[in-house]
Amino acid sequence: MATINQLVRKPRIKLVVKSNVPALEACPQKRGVCTRVYTTTPKKPNSALRKVCRVRLTNGFEVTSYIGGEGHNLQEHSVVLIRGGRVKDLPGVRYHTVRGALDCAGVKDRKQARSKYGVKRPKA
């Protein structure tokens, strides 16, 4: 235990927590415009063509965002909503596009986990 005199001379340092999603600036989501929509390949043990897009956010940041689900309607100049959440096998991809918001349509014919892919409840 440090004495009061020691603490006066050298105070306890606060732990600085670094954000995993700095471009969001402590917001839950941010809006942006797609500057490039393309596919990329994942890291070593995995193999696929992952759909990603480069997004210029309203705060000026340019980030890479993953497009989840099967099939999408995004192209250059599409307005999308970005949330945090990295993709483990894609280096540098720390954001996800929100399906079913703004210009990004929900996943077609999705029956399970619909809320994650912006799909309304089907008519029974």
Swiss-Prot record:
PANTHER family assigned to the protein according to its UniProt record, in alphabetical order: 30S RIBOSOMAL PROTEIN S12 FAMILY MEMBER
Assigned keywords, A-Z: Methylation, Ribonucleoprotein, Ribosomal protein, RNA-binding, rRNA-binding, tRNA-binding
Family: Belongs to the universal ribosomal protein uS12 family.
HAMAP family linked: Ribosomal_uS12_B
PROSITE patterns: RIBOSOMAL_S12
GO biological process terms on file: translation
Official protein name in the record: Small ribosomal subunit protein uS12
Residues recorded with modification 3-methylthioaspartic acid: D89
Function of the molecule: With S4 and S5 plays an important role in translational accuracy. Interacts with and stabilizes bases of the 16S rRNA that are involved in tRNA selection in the A site and with the mRNA backbone. Located at the interface of the 30S and 50S subunits, it traverses the body of the 30S subunit contacting proteins on the other side and probably holding the rRNA structure together. The combined cluster of proteins S8, S12 and S17 appears to hold together the shoulder and platform of the 30S subunit.
